[in-house]
C-alpha cells in the first residue's frame, strides 16, 4: 500500500522547528496569495558583522534557478560589447550606461563589468552599493569572461552577503517549483554559505534558519538535521 503523504499545518504563532522537507511542503500547502510568491531563506549567522574578517559573502548557481527574470547591465569594451548583447544583456555600454544608472530610469537587477571599465563603474558606488549590485570580483561580476557571467546569471546564479545584523537573506525559488526543486536549491545555497565560513571564526556558525513565502510568516528550520 502506498504510504500517504503527511500534510503539515502552520500558523503565525507556531514556533515548532521543522526539517527542511517538511517546511517546504508546509509552505506549498499554505499558499494563499493570488500571485506566484518567491520562497526566501534567512540564515542568522553567529558572526560579528562589525569585524570585516567575519563577514560572509559569495555566489552560487542554484540547480533550478530562482524563477526570476532579471535585467542585466554590462560595462565593457571592444568585442565584448557584441558578446554581451548576444549573451542576453539588457543594457551594454560605458558613459551612456553610467548616465542611465545615475538617472535611475531603468530597472537593473545585476551589473557586470570588465576590469578596464571600473574607473567608470567605481563612481556609481553610491547608487549601486546600497542596492547590493556593485560589481565585485568575489561575486564574479568583475570579470573578463562576460559571456559566462551573463549566462550563469540567467540560469540562476545568486549573490549573497550578510547584513549589519549578521543575517543572509536570499531567494531560492518560487512557490510553483516542485518540492524536490526547492529542496535541492535550498541545500545548494545552505552548503555554499557553510563553505564560506570565515577561517577566523570559531564556534557554532548557524544560529537560526527560517524560510518563508513573500507574504507568509517564517518557518524555523532544524539546521542540525541538514
From Swiss-Prot:
What Pfam families does the annotation carry? Answer: Ribosomal_L1 (PF00687)
Q: Which CDD domains match?
A: Ribosomal_L1
Q: Which NCBIfam families match?
A: rplA_bact
Q: Which InterPro entries match?
A: Ribosom_uL1_bac-type, Ribosomal_uL1, Ribosomal_uL1-like, Ribosomal_uL1/biogenesis, Ribosomal_uL1_3-a/b-sand, Ribosomal_uL1_CS
Per the record, the GO terms for biological process are: regulation of translation; translation
Q: Which family does it belong to?
A: Belongs to the universal ribosomal protein uL1 family.
Question: Is Cell cycle among the key words of this record?
Answer: no
Is Repressor one of the keywords UniProt gives this record? yes
SUPFAM superfamilies from the UniProt entry: Ribosomal protein L1
Q: Which UniProt keywords apply?
A: Repressor, Ribonucleoprotein, Ribosomal protein, RNA-binding, rRNA-binding, Translation regulation, tRNA-binding
Q: How does it assemble?
A: Part of the 50S ribosomal subunit.
Describe its function: Binds directly to 23S rRNA. The L1 stalk is quite mobile in the ribosome, and is involved in E site tRNA release. Protein L1 is also a translational repressor protein, it controls the translation of the L11 operon by binding to its mRNA.
GO terms for molecular function, please? rRNA binding; structural constituent of ribosome; tRNA binding
Name of this chain's protein: Large ribosomal subunit protein uL1
One cellular-component annotation, GO: cytosolic large ribosomal subunit
Amino acid at each position: 500500500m502506498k504510504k500517504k503523504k503527511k500534510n503539515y499545518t502552520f500558523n503565525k504563532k507556531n514556533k515548532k522547528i521543522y526539517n527542511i522537507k517538511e517546511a517546504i511542503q508546509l509552505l506549498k500547502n499554505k499558499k494563499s496569495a493570488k500571485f506566484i510568491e518567491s520562497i526566501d531563506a534567512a540564515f542568522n549567522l553567529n558572526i560579528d558583522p562589525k569585524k570585516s574578517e567575519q563577514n560572509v559573502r559569495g555566489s552560487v548557481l542554484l540547480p533550478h534557478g530562482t524563477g526570476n527574470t532579471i535585467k542585466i547591465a554590462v560595462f565593457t569594451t571592444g568585442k565584448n560589447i557584441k558578446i554581451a548583447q548576444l549573451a542576453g544583456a539588457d543594457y551594454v555600454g560605458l558613459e551612456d550606461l553610467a548616465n542611465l544608472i545615475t538617472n535611475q530610469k531603468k530597472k537593473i537587477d545585476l551589473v557586470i563589468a570588465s576590469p578596464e571599465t571600473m574607473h567608470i563603474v567605481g563612481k556609481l558606488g553610491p547608487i549601486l552599493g546600497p542596492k547590493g549590485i556593485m560589481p565585485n570580483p568575489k561575486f564574479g561580476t568583475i570579470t573578463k569572461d562576460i559571456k559566462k557571467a551573463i549566462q550563469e546569471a540567467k540560469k540562476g546564479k545568486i549573490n549573497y552577503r550578510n547584513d549589519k545584523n549578521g543575517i543572509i537573506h536570499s531567494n531560492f525559488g518560487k512557490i510553483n517549483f516542485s518540492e524536490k526543486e526547492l529542496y535541492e536549491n535550498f541545500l545548494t545555497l545552505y552548503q555554499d554559505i557553510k563553505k564560506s565560513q570565515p577561517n577566523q571564526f570559531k564556534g557554532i556558525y548557524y544560529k537560526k534558519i527560517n524560510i518563508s513565502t513573500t507574504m507568509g510568516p517564517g518557518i524555523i528550520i532544524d539546521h542540525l538535521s541538514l
